[in-house]
């Protein structure tokens, strides 16, 4: 129905807004790291690791040492992956990890 199609479109639009927000916050954090000459770390866990019951406060612990914490999806758009890969790259999550890792290796403070 039209209502379902409209709802699906709205959901996809919102998902894109969320991705954009995450990327912009990642870029903002990277600028902060550079401006304040501090370190950052990219936590590249599974998406469910954002749950405090699973990550046991690790991001907050790292941050308490004045180390900025970023997620892989906040920096993956900044990296490129040389292809072909020597691994099977069939999942989007792993593709983002490869991009994030390739970006991180170019940064002295990450």
Description of each model-found segment:
Residues 1-110:
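An N-terminal assembly and electron-transfer interface module characteristic of large anaerobic redox
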